[in-house]
Amino acid sequence: VGASAVVWLAEGIACDLALPPAAQADETTAELRAALGAEPVDVIVQQAETRRKKILLADMDSTMIDQECIDELADEIGVKDRVAAITARSMNGEIAFEPALRERVALLKGLDAAVVDRIVANRLTLASGGRALVQTMRANGAWTALVSGGFEVFTTRIAEMLGFQENRANRLLDLGGRFTGLVGEPILGRAAKAEALLEICARLGLTPADAIAVGDGANDLDMIRLAGTGVALHAKPTVAAQAKVRIDHADLTALLYLQGYRKEDFLQ
């Protein structure tokens, strides 16, 4: 591809290639992927001058954590397979997010709200590299926001564990300590994630070009497209194909490397 230099950000893990000024992003990406073949290596071609971002906007389920919280809630009442099937179709963009969420939440009616604590303690695992991503960007002056189509009862806890400064999500309604089967309106879905990015930019005096956004589902696409660097992380092919950046192999530290951070810059 005519690179004039190779700079290792982490030996054997991530490197920068200095490309010719005339290099075209799509063509160079295709060339590099073809050269790598089946090697588990992610490729991002971008302008070095503008890659360091001032805002991080991240999805939660299957992005900052390894699970889908609504599927774990459903498992508590024996309907996980039914709910997970709807989740998968929604993530693929086969069905609209909002009606799919209402349908799944209705199946949780009567579930003891206290189960959330048990799920957080015993079932949820933080995605690899997530804490380093949030803490390193914060230490370098970035604003970090967890924006989820999931539920506040989980995002408040996960945001605290990872160090996000802000979190937004949907409200699972409960009465007398049990879920009612209803979700608070309006629902935070695909459009609301992009709106959250615009609101945060306006508040901070920045633009979407100053942001990096990461998610894995169809409801993340508007946010991913709007951000200066939009990342589809281990996403379904239909989602990954529409993102500026796709990470199929690496963990969340890839979002630091693609901004030019070296491994020794990472905080935990």
Regions found by a protein language model. Name each.
Residues E49-T50, K54, S90-A114, R178, ...:
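Long, charged amphipathic helices and adjacent flexible linkers at domain junctions
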Residues V6, V83, A113-V116:
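Short, surface-exposed acidic
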Residues Q47, M60-D61, Q67-E68, L73, ...:
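Fold-independent oxyanion-binding glycine-rich loops
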Residues P40, E94-I95, A142, G205:
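Residue-level recognition of short, well-ordered coil/turn positions
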Residues A30, G110, V115-Q268:
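C-terminal cap/substrate-recognition subdomain and adjoining C-terminal extension
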